[in-house]
Curated annotation (Swiss-Prot):
One of its GO terms (biological process) is detoxification of iron ion. Residues 1-99, 151-236, 281-300 are cytoplasmic. Induction: Down-regulated under iron starvation by TIS11. Transcriptionally up-regulated by YAP5 in response to increased cytosolic iron. It holds the Pfam family VIT1. It comes from the Eukaryota. Belongs to the CCC1 family. The lineage of its organism: Eukaryota, Fungi, Dikarya, Ascomycota, Saccharomycotina. This is Protein CCC1. Has a role in both calcium and manganese homeostasis. Involved in the transfer of iron and Mn(2+) from the cytosol to the vacuole for storage of these metals. Residues 60-70 have a biased composition (Polar residues). Residues 19-86 are annotated as: Disordered.
């Protein structure tokens, strides 16, 4: 990643901070001198600390970068064209939070598999009413369980994120030099060839808005994004609703036939088609334009095989025990 890309990332973080004010309590420290002398044994850190007083804002480096030919821009334009085509193909789903899509896929995946296996197993007992009653009982309890699991998982992610932010804020107030070291380590991990002047210039630019130093470390050092508002509730409803919706599919055919064997056949036919298209569409949503037709077909077949094995095993063992 180039320094231009890194500065673009900082601009994004600035816009985010202005919009959300997520760590605005650090704003009052904007004039605090963050680049101080280092007592570290690391020669790299010593060089950065000693050169910080000589480098104002890396004007020469910035001018060189601005005057250099920007081949990245052309690549970005090509990437934008590909992105536009992908957006046109995905339609509505492109505007939905990827985490919501992920939760929906989790709910649908389990909902299409578990209730199908259960209803297939219960059908071996020969009682359609038992299949419907047992299927609905499992469907409701499963949706609640999946929803609670999604809620707790999202809550744990949110708690971890805010704990990391709090820790970095405390580190900033206790010893802001540690923040500079972390930013330096992140930059060197991105590109070990960054010069001392480039790193110091970047830190000096970033220190103008101190709360962004915390945001930068959290996002690029910890790999964490701020959870969306009401993330826990959205995750619970999406996963639980997806499970409920998916679980209704194998159950519906039993409402329209009197013979449980016929209902099982119809349910299998419906589920083969549904599982295949679910695997196909899931791959298209998750991989976008990077997924080939053969890959999507393969994923669809795999979903059919997994669902079929689960349903077949349930039917066999219930029949064996019955």
């Amino acid at each position: 990643m180039s320094i231009v890309a890194l500065k673009n990332a900082v601009v994004t973080l600035i816009q985010k901070a202005k919009g959300s004010g997520g760590t605005s309590e650090l704003g009052g420290s904007e004039s605090t001198p963050l680049l101080r002398g280092s007592n570290s044994n690391s020669s790299r850190h010593d060089n950065l600390s000693s050169s910080s007083s000589d480098i104002i804002y890396g004007r020469n480096s910035a001018q060189d970068l601005e005057n250099s030919p920007m081949s990245v821009g052309k690549d970005n334009r090509n990437g934008d064209n590909g992105s536009d085509n992908e957006k046109a193909n995905l339609g509505f789903f492109q505007s939905v939070d990827p985490r919501v899509i992920s939760d929906l896929i989790i709910g649908l995946s389990d909902g299409l598999t578990v209730p199908f296996a259960l209803t297939a197993g219960l059908s071996s007992l020969g009682d359609a009413k038992l299949v419907i009653t047992g299927g609905f009982a499992e469907l409701i309890s499963g949706a609640i369980s999946m929803g609670l699991g999604g809620y707790l998982g999202a809550k744990s992610e949110s708690d971890y994120y805010h704990a990391e932010v709090k820790k970095e804020k405390r580190k900033f107030y206790d010893n802001s030099n540690l923040i500079n070291r972390e930013i330096e380590d992140i930059l060197l991990e991105i590109n070990p060839n960054f010069s001392d002047e480039t790193i110091v210039s970047f830190i000096k630019d970033l220190q103008r808005t101190p709360e962004l130093m915390v945001d930068f470390i959290i996002r690029y050092g910890r790999g964490l994004d701020e959870p969306a508002e009401n993330r826990e509730l959205i995750s619970a409803v999406t996963i639980g609703g997806g499970y409920l919706l998916g679980g209704l599919v194998p159950l519906v055919p039993y409402f329209f036939v009197s013979d449980v064997g016929t209902g099982l056949i119809y349910s299998i036919i419906v589920m083969v088609v549904t599982l295949f298209w679910f695997g196909y569409v899931k791959t298209k949503l998750s991989m976008g334009s990077g997924s080939s037709t053969s890959k999507k077909v393969t994923e669809g077949v795999e979903m059919v095989v997994v669902g079929g094995v689960a349903a077949g095993a349930a039917w066999f063992f219930v029949k064996l025990l019955g």
